Regions:
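C-terminal beta-strand edge segments of enzyme domains
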Residues: 2-12, 16, 21-36, 43, ...
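N-terminal, active-site-proximal structural segment of metallo-dependent hydrolase catalytic domains
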Residues: 6-16, 21-80, 86-90
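Short beta-strand scaffold segments in enzyme catalytic cores
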Residues: 126-128, 142-145, 184-186, 265-267, ...
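Cys-nucleophile CN-hydrolase/nitrilase-fold catalytic domain and related Cys-dependent amidase chemistry
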Residues: 59, 68-149, 155, 224-244
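Beta-strand-turn-beta hairpins that frame and shape the catalytic cleft
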Residues: 39-48, 185-194, 215
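Short, glycine-anchored, charge-dense loop/turn motifs used at functional sites
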Residues: 48, 145-153, 268-276
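CN hydrolase (nitrilase-like) catalytic-core segments centered on the catalytic cysteine
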Residues: 104-125, 192, 198-285
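Active-site catalytic loop in hydrolytic enzyme cores
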Residues: 102-105, 134-211, 224-233, 296-303
Length: 312
């Protein structure tokens, strides 16, 4: 190994109790000037976690696995936990999600999320919950946010529906998914959290429409083909251009349907540094979110204030 590379410094964001942060060969984050914040006490660091699964068609089994992994995250101090896209069901066929649809506010998946958030005293983000749509053959791909009392505080319906026609891989979510319309940001004790799902990641204008957010959450089930080519690049790009943390829990592995998902759940800081990553299989990623560090970065590189083309 190149000696210089072996001495790469992990940025301050990855050293202050930030879970399993690992050195990377990416450029280390600078030490931002602290003068503008000198009179203010540092904001507390809080820990977030993303769950990675390789879900199957059995909802009860998936909920049990999600519960186990959430408990693991709580044991590591996470106060906000996000589940991957379709955590409760990766069916044998696309229409399976329609067959387990739930009414808004009712059903076993929503009850699981509410009860778990309340019992573990965490903020919990569950995606995807297949909620009823006006069309009986389609459901909403809904992302639900519960506070630490178990109360639902936000719902986001996936806006951009994935289509792929590449060799032997064919996907068309619009056959079974009803597209959402509304951009959603939720106010939390941890700052403004922007909600998005999987394919949304390819549309930077969605994140601009969120205005200024502190944390972006993007539960996903990227295919191995598209994930290998684009996943990390897209995650880090959204973090860098918005100077925001990104929490990206993902499906990762082989599924009974024959589908392979990319995994590589990760947490990325506002400088684009990967703080934690899980390549494959069930598990969690955990890292600390440092609001003071983020504010200093935004002060040192005020790109968000320099936008001159305002389209949204």
């Amino acid at each position: 190994m190149n000696k210089a590379a072996s001495k790469t410094k992990v940025p301050a964001s990855a050293r202050s109790g930030f879970g399993r942060a690992r050195p990377h060969t990416h450029a280390a984050a600078p030490q931002p000037k602290s003068e503008p914040l000198a009179e203010s006490p540092p904001a507390p660091i809080f820990r977030v976690a993303g769950v990675q699964m390789a879900s199957g068609p059995n909802v009860a089994a998936n909920l049990n696995e999600a519960r186990r992994l959430i408990e693991m995250a709580v044991e590591q101090g996470a106060r906000l936990v996000a589940l991957p896209e379709w955590f409760a069901c990766m069916g044998l066929k696309d229409t399976d999600k329609v067959s387990i649809r739930e009414k808004d506010g009712e059903g076993p998946i929503q009850k699981f999320l509410s009860d778990t958030a309340r019992r573990k005293k965490i903020w919990l983000i569950g995606c995807s919950v297949p909620l009823e749509s006006p069309e009986s053959a389609r459901v909403y791909n809904s992302m639900l946010v519960y506070d630490d009392s178990g109360k639902r505080v936000a719902r986001y319906d996936k806006i951009h529906l994935f289509t792929l026609d590449l060799g032997k891989e064919h996907f068309s979510e619009e056959r079974t998914i009803q597209a959402g319309r509304d951009v959603k940001v939720v106010e939390t004790p941890f700052g403004r959290v922007g909600l998005s799902v999987c394919y949304d990641l390819r549309f930077p204008e969605l994140y601009r429409a969120m205005k200024e957010v502190d944390l972006i959450v993007v539960p996903s089930a990227f295919t191995e083909t598209t994930g290998r080519a684009h996943w990390e690049t897209l995650i880090r790009a959204r973090a860098i251009e918005n100077l925001a943390y990104v929490l990206a829990p993902a499906q990762g592995g082989y599924h009974l349907s024959g589908r392979e998902t990319h995994g590589n759940s990760m947490i990325v800081d506002p400088w684009g540094v990967v703080l934690d990553r899980l390549p494959r299989g069930s598990g969690i990623v955990v890292a600390g979110i440092n609001p003071t560090y983020q504010a200093q970065l935004r002060d040192s590189l005020p790109a968000l204030k320099h936008r001159t083309i305002q389209r949204v």
